Amino acid sequence: MKITDLTDSPKETKRFRVFLDNDKHYDFGLRNSKNGTYIDHKDKIKRENYRKRHYNMKREQPYIKNLIPSPALFSYYLLWGDSTSIHKNIQALNKMMHNNI
């Protein structure tokens, strides 16, 4: 599975929409978040706190750990990924998903 496109979400409360090569799409990220995300503020401490908090949520962990397409996965790796560039984070996640096949 591969991310093929990223656009602004048409949903009022979501920030982005990703499109996958299987014709599915997912809306994710809180629009107009007052605190922003790692791609906005570039604060590594906030990023680590977000990752720990969300990885330990029973509802989100299986999606993140097993690279299952979901809003939780895309927020974790694209908005709070290793890079402050969402496009670099897309490349990294695509590589991880390809290697996970």
Kindly give the residue locations of the regions a language model identified.
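Arg/Lys-rich, low-complexity, intrinsically disordered basic segments
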Residues: 1-101
